[in-house]
Amino acid sequence: MQVVKKDGSKEEFDKQKIINSCLSAGLAPDVAEKIGNELENLAYDGIETKELRILILNKIRKEDSSCAQKWIDYEQNKT
């Protein structure tokens, strides 16, 4: 399954990237894994990273709202 990046390039969907970003925001490992699994099931070939980010943020807010801003900060500051 391919993900379309902001610049139009494509890369293979990587559930571990989602899990790692959730962990970086302070979510518990089991919650991060759960979100990764849910996104793997929701994603489709050609999904854009922008849509994935919205889905991830919504899942984080439902699981642990205190981590939502940390995740946003992490996403904005990663290189």
Pin down the residues of each PLM region:
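Long, C-terminal-biased catalytic regions of enzyme "large/alpha" subunits
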Residues: 1-79
